[in-house]
């Protein structure tokens, strides 16, 4: 069993007062963009009428809740961030924002996002948003990430919940469709983050994070990436023959999934040298495009169906 060093290193002292850009960085805007986009698709797919103001309110609350979770993640992981090249320039390690400031910022945003969603939209959606924040901050950040190589697999549930929250904002209930969206993101998460972990392996090892390549080795990680990619392709395509999504989505999901599978096979085959590094980077980059494209196609289908209803 590997011994992981999780002892923190001293953080940089405050070098100046925090600016707006520092607090925006705490929100993890790149992650937030994915949260907003998948939530928007979930909201527009939901049946029934929904006032535009409430729709905008729901999306903003989900985005702010996701940002709050990101800020609380940075608050708790300041020791890890300081050790990793990829994260050393974040506001807390750089001394731009203190840990108490990040904690206060994150808790305030979390509270107001949940309460606002509950009061103005409905409390089922608010409860799901609160659970999402709790799962990401407590279950994933505080527990899973430091203690198990399955951190990404289990913790990925938090990142898969935004379209479920958005659907519940409209309907006040759950259904098969948002669960399908959840499953797509859930199975997408391991190949995406394990590809990152492969070419950032030294970074994670230095920080004491038990990512799969650190604990089980790169070769086992490559196998798991391939297996989860196969599962992802099947899960993403399944809604079409089951009658939940249309043929355009079905064909596109197979095409996108087929190429992602090709990239995963390349990761599995190339195990050393520049070819291995190139394969993992290509899979990581394409996985981002894959998810955005898949949900964009769903968005187009929803908008097209709405237009046809109006002119029909």
From Swiss-Prot:
It is an enzyme of class 2 (transferase). GO terms for molecular function: protoheme IX farnesyltransferase activity. Coiled coil: none annotated. It comes from the Bacteria. Pfam families: UbiA (PF01040). One of its GO terms (biological process) is heme O biosynthetic process. It is a multi-pass membrane protein. It is found in: Cell inner membrane. The keyword Transmembrane helix applies. Pathway: Porphyrin-containing compound metabolism; heme O biosynthesis; heme O from protoheme: step 1/1. Its EC number is 2.5.1.141. This is Protoheme IX farnesyltransferase. It comes from Rhodopseudomonas palustris (strain ATCC BAA-98 / CGA009). The gene is ctaB.
């Amino acid at each position: 069993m590997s011994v992981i060093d999780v002892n923190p290193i001293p953080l940089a002292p405050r070098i100046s007062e925090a600016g707006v850009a520092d607090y925006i960085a705490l929100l993890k805007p790149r992650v937030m963009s994915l949260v907003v986009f998948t939530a928007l698709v979930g909201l527009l797919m939901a049946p029934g009428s929904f006032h535009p103001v409430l729709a905008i309110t729901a999306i903003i609350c989900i985005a702010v809740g996701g940002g709050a979770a990101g800020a609380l993640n940075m608050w708790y992981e300041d020791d890890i961030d300081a050790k990793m090249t990829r994260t050393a320039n974040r506001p807390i390690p750089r001394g731009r924002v203190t840990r108490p400031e990040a904690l206060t910022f994150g808790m305030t945003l979390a509270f107001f996002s949940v309460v606002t969603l509950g009061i103005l939209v409905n409390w089922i959606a608010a409860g799901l948003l609160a659970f999402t924040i709790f799962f990401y901050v407590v279950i994933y950040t505080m527990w899973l990430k430091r203690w198990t190589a399955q951190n990404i697999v289990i913790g990925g549930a938090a990142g898969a919940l935004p379209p479920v929250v958005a659907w519940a904002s409209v309907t006040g209930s759950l259904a098969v469709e948002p669960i399908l969206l959840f499953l797509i993101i859930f199975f997408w998460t391991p190949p995406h983050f394990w590809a990152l972990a492969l070419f950032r392996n030294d970074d994670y090892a230095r920080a004491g994070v038990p990512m799969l390549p650190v604990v089980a080795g790169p070769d086992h990680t490559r196998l798991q990436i391939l297996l989860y990619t196969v599962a992802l392709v099947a899960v993403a395509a399944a809604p079409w023959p089951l009658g939940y999504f249309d043929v355009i989505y079905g064909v596109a999901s197979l095409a996108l999934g087929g190429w992602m599978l090709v990239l995963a096979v390349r990761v599995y085959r190339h195990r050393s040298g520049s070819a291995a590094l190139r394969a993992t980077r290509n899979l990581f980059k394409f996985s981002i495009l894959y998810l955005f494209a898949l949900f964009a196609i769903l968005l187009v289908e929803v908008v097209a169906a709405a237009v046809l209803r109006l002119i029909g």
